Amino acid sequence: MGPLWFCCLPLALLPLLAAVEETLMDSTTATAELGWMVHPPSGWEEVSGYDENMNTIRTYQVCNVFESSQNNWLRTKYIRRRGAHRIHVEMKFSVRDCSSIPNVPGSCKETFNLYYYESDFDSATKTFPNWMENPWMKVDTIAADESFSQVDLGGRVMKINTEVRSFGPVSKNGFYLAFQDYGGCMSLIAVRVFYRKCPRVIQNGAVFQETLSGAESTSLVAARGTCISNAEEVDVPIKLYCNGDGEWLVPIGRCMCRPGYESVENGTVCRGCPSGTFKASQGDEGCVHCPINSRTTSEGATNCVCRNGYYRADADPVDMPCTTIPSAPQAVISSVNETSLMLEWTPPRDSGGREDLVYNIICKSCGSGRGACTRCGDNVQFAPRQLGLTEPRIYISDLLAHTQYTFEIQAVNGVTDQSPFSPQFASVNITTNQAAPSAVSIMHQVSRTVDSITLSWSQPDQPNGVILDYELQYYEKNLSELNSTAVKSPTNTVTVQNLKAGTIYVFQVRARTVAGYGRYSGKMYFQTMTEAEYQTSVQEKLPLIIGSSAAGLVFLIAVVVIIIVCNRRRGFERADSEYTDKLQHYTSGHSTYRGPPPGLGVRLFVMTPGMKIYIDPFTYEDPNEAVREFAKEIDISCVKIEQVIGAGEFGEVCSGHLKLPGKREIFVAIKTLKSGYTEKQRRDFLSEASIMGQFDHPNVIHLEGVVTKSSPVMIITEFMENGSLDSFLRQNDGQFTVIQLVGMLRGIAAGMKYLADMNYVHRDLAARNILVNSNLVCKVSDFGLSRFLEDDTSDPTYTSALGGKIPIRWTAPEAIQYRKFTSASDVWSYGIVMWEVMSYGERPYWDMTNQDVINAIEQDYRLPPPMDCPNALHQLMLDCWQKDRNHRPKFGQIVNTLDKMIRNPNSLKAMAPLSSGVNLPLLDRTIPDYTSFNTVDEWLDAIKMSQYKESFASAGFTTFDIVSQMTVEDILRVGVTLAGHQKKILNSIQVMRAQMNQIQSVEV
């Protein structure tokens, strides 16, 4: 059973190292008499003897076996315990076999007793402590394993017994030992008193100092270890337990060598990794050699540094070899098909030693081949994608016809971003062929009768050559497309005759070049008039015809009179009576009739062939009639309000859903009229719906309908996900290309052209009143709001002027001074909107007061170009800001100009200089003088980059001298990742540097 128990003992309980014994008293070291106390004197006797090595020692012996009732005591001198809790006593003795003694009485013994007595000082006397078991504490009865006889004595054979006993706990400063004989014949040869402790040891990477054993034989004393040099604890705090026999047991926790150090000398030393090796993590494993293309520069390395020209990606493990960028792709093959292209190539000769090779395609348009190439626009399509291609092929479409392109095929891998060099690439030059035009994007109804419809459409976005003609296909909605009829037109306007009255027709149009027909446009639905509608229209036009004739006659007479007056008063300036005109006049190249139709109040009619004319709802005697005529009434049960997204002049603005019977549910914006309104407020609120309901254009906000028959009164419009243009631009500062910004401006101009063609004057055109949807389509909104602003409004944007509030910063000078609002004054406002867009929502005229703005405009000062604004766009702004309104461009001309810029992106490459060569002086607030600021924080506030204050400060860029030396790498390091923000800060730093040089030259 014993051997089996030993084999099954848990390894954790096996002793780690032999105990250390500290001797408190050893009788064998005495060179003179021991002088121990005996009682009675006739008992124990001190004599000199020899040990097993024949060394002279002092011993005690007793042999009173022939006398009965023996009680012989032997007491040691006072022994100090020196902090020990458990005492061990080793006794060497010999005992005479009682049976070998002739005639010995039965009281003969072969054992003796061991006692101890504790005391804080040496207090024993001849009589104290009493010679009895109490107060003495008995340790054990000691019996001999071997005893000697008369024969042994004759042969001088010594049979010495060695016994060890322990006792504890002891707590006083010292103790005495006593040996009691009660009738034996024995010799106490040697007594050694000692205690045990666990030795100093290095175990599990930690040093454990000497530790005293516990008071009991089963005690475990916990000892806290200290990690060896360059090691750290893992898991739980490291401990060892010292048992009662002075042996270490039960190790808990461990220390392991830190990264950069390995365990040597049986785990007792953590040595730094030699040069050329490294260790990345904590543990017992050894250092390993550096991966390929890497090295270390010192001992104790945790990773190996890549050699020049080699890199390690952020996600690469430290034991991965350093790699490099790939070489260029090879054997590029291109296949052009009209305006599409297939590119194929073979992988690079050298992948850089990596497997994450991908390809990027850089497209550059070189026009006719002369001049610098520019990046392709967003219209070019790449399949499967432009960046991160895993296969060596790509299909590119929607290229411009007759255009030279350069395509760079970049080979990149996981370390390309780490390299300071540009990716290696293979380039190919191609020229596209002639191609059919793209689809027509939008079609408008110009006019209609009972049997005809006149339609107009815009030129395709990509004509790809000269448009020869258009083909219009149409058919009744309730019939199949197989029943369609085609009509050709050399222009973008056509009148379709011989249609059925009151019938809905489906129309599609496509353009043709020498390369053939393009795709048909999307289906558009238009309806002819019913007979009843036609009769009503004729009756309404009769007064207009009469009025037009009369107006024509008056016009001829006026021309004659003017000629006579001019001839008589040549050289004198004629007073301009326009400024006394307080009404909004709608003028065009056709006659105007201002007489009221029967049953209605005064309305303004302007006739332009094929174009709807805006009717002012305030000319109705009953404005509610205008709401009924132009706005669709919606049942409140179809509207679901979800959340409030803002507040307007008349109430809250909410988002929600509209579900009309038979139609899909759509997301809408809902304006509500606050409770407690007056009748005038209700009329003014609904007037905007009466205005919006007359408009139908992709760049004008669309009215879904109104709710007037229940409370609250609502205006429901399409929902624009990105909100107002000014805040949208500020939130996305620097995120769009110039072409994208011009596209936004083109949409706004197209919407304003539509409104101007209808003879509607907006009066409050500003970026805050332009809404943007999820596709970045901009739409004009907020109709008639400025018309109803009261004098007590608190909005600082609007300032009192001549009977109302005017947004000074956006308003033309004649409108400010004389309240003269026309489409020409809207053009001035459009120029300000252009400036807002190109500056990403910056406030026009910055922090100038409204009066300062008025004074500056009167002195012919104009806004300077925003940062990175093309010269062509700033020149168009200046054209819009001509003082003479007759010299400003029409919205149609603006649309054509922007279309040309979009078709020819090279025209947008020339940036406007800070001091333009135009005749008008420019306000200079583009980049402030750094000397006007006390701190870098103030400078960042001034250039509207305050979000980077903490980044500049934490990176140490706290003085202008340091900031002026910043590079692109420094700007990236402080966390400026947006390209627009980088340009703005770099431009400001360049000006700061120039200003510093100028100051230094003046000081010299």
Curated annotation (Swiss-Prot):
Gene3D superfamilies: ephrin a2 ectodomain, Galactose-binding domain-like, Immunoglobulins, Phosphorylase Kinase, domain 1, Transcription Factor, Ets-1, Transferase(Phosphotransferase) domain 1, Tumor Necrosis Factor Receptor, subunit A, domain 2. GO terms for molecular function: ATP binding; protein tyrosine kinase activity; transmembrane-ephrin receptor activity. Pfam families: EphA2_TM, Ephrin_lbd, Ephrin_rec_like, fn3, PK_Tyr_Ser-Thr, SAM_1. SMART domains: EPH_lbd, Ephrin_rec_like, FN3, SAM, TyrKc. Residues 639-902 form the Protein kinase domain. It is a single-pass type I membrane protein. Residues 21-203 form the Eph LBD domain. InterPro entries: Eph_TM (IPR027936), EphB2_rcpt_lig-bd (IPR034238), Ephrin_rcpt_lig-bd_dom (IPR001090), Ephrin_rcpt_TKs (IPR050449), FN3_dom (IPR003961), FN3_sf (IPR036116), Galactose-bd-like_sf (IPR008979), Growth_fac_rcpt_cys_sf (IPR009030). Glycans are attached at N266, N337, N429, N478, N483. The active site is at D764. ATP binds at I645, G646, A647, G648, E649, F650, G651, E652, V653, K671. Disulfide bonds join C63-C185, C98-C108. The chain crosses the membrane at residues 545-565. Belongs to the protein kinase superfamily. Tyr protein kinase family. Ephrin receptor subfamily. Heterotetramer upon binding of the ligand. The heterotetramer is composed of an ephrin dimer and a receptor dimer. Oligomerization is probably required to induce biological responses. This is Ephrin type-B receptor 2. It comes from Gallus gallus. The lineage of its organism: Eukaryota, Metazoa, Chordata, Craniata, Vertebrata.
